[in-house]
Amino acid sequence: MSRPAHKTDTIVAVDVLVTSPGRNFVALKITTEQGLVGWGDATLNGRELAVASYLRDHVAPLLIGRDPARIEDTWQYLYRGAYWRRGPVTMTSIGAVDLALWDIKGKATGQPVYQLLGGAVRDRILTYTHASGWEIPQLLDAVDERREQGFLAVRAQSGIPGLATVYGVSSGEAGYEPADRGAAPAVEVWDTDSYLRHAPRVLAAVREHVGPELKLLHDAHHRLTPGQAARLGRALEEVDLYWLEDVTPAENQEVLRHIRHHTTVPLAIGEVFNTVWECQTLITEQLIDFVRTCVTHAGGISHLRRIAALAEVWQVRLGPHGPSDVSPVALAASLHVGLATPNFAIQEYMGYEPVVHEVFRHAWSYADGHLHPGDQPGLGVEVDEALAARFPYEPAYLPIARRRDGSMTDW
């Protein structure tokens, strides 16, 4: 005879907040009968309302009456119970619930989440930020500015001659923000040949300028063929990159075997992956050095830990996606995982506009090139709901890319 379930608390309310303090975020609030509140992040850049609807219409009704302490059972319930599972909308929704439940468990026990994950294995988490410039001198100035801010690792992106817009390069004084507000996505023109001619010169100039100590990263953003990726990797080996990111479209994983045979440059991929199964071949065949899965988009803390555990066996490290297109709740969750995970290598961090820090009050902090989640119970982030309500959702889309002949290509 099975033992009756012992329930110490009950979920009584689930609310979805969509707010746009400078850019769109989706937050999930779970409230228990004992008055505990847990926060999760459900932001999916350019598709925020799809996740908000999935949560409100298909997930929230299922959570009422459940025991918030049963985190893994709830994860399995939402994942296996959705026959049409996987995909960014489903996994981001599950991730938001998972984060909120870990937040509640931390508050219920008076512990920061990283303590519930086994405790800290490091004192702080190395982070990298972004630097860009249309010309090499501008890029070098931007890299110097990041170094003055204490960063020990920088992703460098530059303009390309003949192209009016380039992924990762700011168009003005403000930081880079790819999502444009409006009724339709912006169209950018892309030329791979120009990029392949220009990128090695740019990154070599950055390395010569900064010397050997700075960790230097670069993102090709899924735009290359296998042959082009291998060629670029070979050209960048003397630059000593920390990693070369997303060289080919993520759907075509088999091509990483070809690329791996032709270059020793460290490879990173995974920000668009949603489950451990998408990472499995790349990890177990050691076709990558870093997996970049995001805690929000990959089913939350519970599932990111599964990815980390598989990766650790095969000596693959984590470097999760975490720019400003996920909220401070997501960054906090990633930091708690990072502090407690042996093969966690580095965390992406671009910072936020000041108003975002006001809406999402957080315990995590940055100093000297590193982040720490703080020691408040739970995730250490609270949302000012009244302030969030002052920033209603504004439609925004990530750009699309076309070649010079007008045909579509990967952005």
Curated annotation (Swiss-Prot):
**Biological process, per Gene Ontology:** carbohydrate catabolic process
Binding locations of Mg(2+): 219, 245, 271
Similarity annotation: Belongs to the mandelate racemase/muconate lactonizing enzyme family. GalD subfamily.
Q: What is this protein called?
A: D-galactonate dehydratase family member SBI_01856
- The answer, when asked if NAD is one of the entry's keywords, is no
Q: EC annotation?
A: 4.2.1.-, 4.2.1.39
Which InterPro entries does the record match to this protein?
D-mannonate_dehydratase-like, D-mannonate_dehydratase_GalD, DgoD-like, Enolase-like_C_sf, Enolase-like_N, Enolase_C-like, Mandelate_racemase_C, Mandelate_racemase_N_dom
Function description: Has low D-gluconate dehydratase activity (in vitro), suggesting that it has no significant role in D-gluconate degradation in vivo. Has no detectable activity with a panel of 70 other acid sugars (in vitro).
Give any GO molecular function from the UniProt entry: gluconate dehydratase activity
List the residues marked with site Important for activity and substrate specificity. 323
The record's catalysed reaction(s) read: D-gluconate = 2-dehydro-3-deoxy-D-gluconate + H2O
Q: Which domain of life is it from?
A: Bacteria
Keyword list (alphabetical) reads: Carbohydrate metabolism, Lyase, Magnesium, Metal-binding
Residue numbers binding substrate: 45, 130, 271, 292, 321, 325, 348
**What's the top EC group for this one?**
lyase
